[in-house]
């Protein structure tokens, strides 16, 4: 009992003296603390968190993924070829996005089906904003023309004609329709029907390309162009023969590549990107992306084409942004 009292008394003494020490030291601690100002002093030394042009440009990069199926063989890097930088003024407009930026995608049934270019359109709207157009569902039965709101952003129009070649598309009515949209960029996707002409003549194809581009260039000041090559298709070997990869597709692609090179235009070579002469058709076919006619594509096939175009497009844009950092 006595031991318990001694322990209690000892503990009480320690607490008592600790309290005394704290009371004695408190005034000194308070005296050492600087007086707090009644109002915070403005920070005159810090700078904005993103002060440099390089950082501002770096923030314009757009993330993009590679949609190429792993089962596709002998593919090439998915890029837009533009050695003279013909699209640089367009990329500059895109990086600023201070007005509605109008893209008009013209072509054959691959464009007329709307799915291939619509995937591209939706991806660009996700990248740069969708306020420039009304959110109206698009399918095969609807118009491919976007309805503008007047706000800044991507305006992507789709004008395709079933069975069209570059030559047959170039009627005054259709060209006037393109011109009336005031495009900043025109994407031309022809070639499948040119390749299905049994008597394909490269010089005639090249002349048709030149007529269309020349007329549009004269009527649309400051417009830029992006050519695309066809995805590939099968034809019958004889009237009732087995279907084989269309041997004229390679000639059509060569014509379009040569025309782009000689006239300083940008081109996206879808055909060679997905396997070219040896593998393009086989890759599409093995993936189950052809329809029964082996010319047109399934929903999955057109979605993939739209994603591939978007990837190449954004990679070219990001390359432009990178040059601004140099």
Q: Where are the regions that the model predicts?
A:
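Serine-dependent acyl-ester chemistry module
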Residues: 177, 192-210, 222, 227-254, ...
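Catalytic His-Asp segment of secreted/periplasmic serine-dependent ester chemistry enzymes
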Residues: 232-326
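Alpha-helical scaffolding within the catalytic cores
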Residues: 82-93, 167-179, 207-215, 251, ...
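Conserved catalytic region of serine esterases and O-acyltransferases that act on ester linkages
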Residues: 33-83, 139, 143-144, 288-326
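Bacterial Sec-dependent N-terminal signal peptides
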Residues: 1-42
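Solvent-exposed, polar/charged alpha-helical surfaces in well-ordered, non-transmembrane soluble domains
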Residues: 114, 118-122, 176, 203, ...
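Conserved SGNH/GDSL esterase-like catalytic core that processes O-acyl groups on lipids
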Residues: 102, 110-207, 218
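Structural recognition of the beta-strand scaffold that forms the well-ordered cores
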Residues: 102-106, 155-159, 185-189, 224-229, ...
């Amino acid at each position: 009992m006595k031991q318990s009292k001694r322990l209690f008394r000892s503990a009480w003494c320690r607490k008592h003296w600790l309290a005394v020490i704290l009371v004695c030291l408190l005034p000194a601690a308070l005296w050492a603390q600087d007086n707090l100002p009644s109002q915070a002093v403005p920070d005159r030394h810090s700078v904005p968190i993103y002060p440099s042009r390089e950082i501002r440009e770096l923030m314009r990069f757009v993330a993009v993924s590679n949609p190429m199926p792993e089962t596709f063989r002998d593919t090439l890097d998915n890029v837009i070829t533009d050695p003279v930088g013909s699209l640089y003024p367009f990329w500059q407009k895109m990086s600023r996005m201070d007005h509605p930026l109008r893209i008009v995608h013209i072509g054959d049934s691959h464009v007329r089906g709307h799915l291939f270019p619509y995937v591209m359109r939706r991806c660009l709207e996700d990248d740069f904003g969708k306020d420039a157009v009304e959110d109206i569902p698009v399918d095969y039965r609807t118009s491919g023309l976007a309805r503008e709101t007047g706000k800044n952003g991507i305006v992507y129009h789709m004008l395709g004609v079933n069975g069209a070649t570059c030559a047959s598309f170039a009627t005054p009515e259709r060209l006037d329709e393109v011109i009336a949209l005031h495009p900043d960029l025109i994407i031309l996707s022809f070639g499948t029907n040119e390749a299905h002409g049994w008597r394909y003549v490269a010089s005639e194809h090249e002349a048709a390309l030149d007529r269309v581009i020349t007329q549009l260039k004269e009527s649309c000041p400051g417009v830029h162009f992006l050519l695309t090559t066809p995805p590939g298709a099968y034809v019958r070997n004889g009237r009732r023969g087995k279907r084989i990869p269309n041997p004229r597709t390679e000639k059509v692609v060569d014509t379009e590549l040569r025309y782009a090179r000689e006239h300083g235009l940008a081109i996206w070579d879808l055909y060679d990107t997905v396997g070219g002469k040896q593998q393009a058709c086989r890759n599409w076919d093995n993936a189950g992306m052809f329809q029964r006619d082996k010319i047109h594509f399934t929903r999955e096939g057109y979605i993939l084409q739209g994603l591939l175009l978007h990837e190449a497009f954004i990679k070219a844009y990001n390359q432009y942004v990178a040059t601004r950092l140099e």
